Amino acid sequence: MRLNLYLRNGKVIIPTLGAVHQRLYRDIEPVAVADVSDAEGIRRALYATIARGNPPTPYYKQGIYPQPVVVKYAGVKSWSAFARGTSTWDIKERDANYRIVGRSLGRDGWVEDPNKTIDFPPGTSVDVVIDRMIAILQDATRRPQGD
């Protein structure tokens, strides 16, 4: 299981992450949005998104590349506008082992940031992972942009 979270202007945007092919994923509907101060809203959204898993998702048709689904939930018109001022994380689970991966915006898009990666001990419950993710999101709103 894998999911993406985006934090932009005090809103947490959590799309379903569709599995296109092996390690290729893309954000799809449904998308949950919660205010970063609403811990219970974020928690419900994360549980629901995790329960959906990574449903099989087709490739885009050749030559047709619509704006990513999360753009409209941020109230912007383009992916580049969305990326500016957005922080992003992944939650990954494999064989009941969880990892939160923070990303930083580089020249070629978001890249995994080893300084923002948390590996949880084997057997850690999803509840602990979700609580930590909520704390990270809420802490990120208290820090100046770019830290």
Which role fits each region the language model picked out?
Residues 1-40, 91-131, 135, 142-146:
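Intrinsically disordered, low-complexity regulatory segments enriched in Ser/Thr/Pro
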Residues 32-88, 112-116:
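Negatively charged, low-complexity tracts enriched in Asp/Glu with abundant Ser/Thr
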Residues 47-55, 131, 135-142:
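Short, intrinsically disordered, mixed-charge
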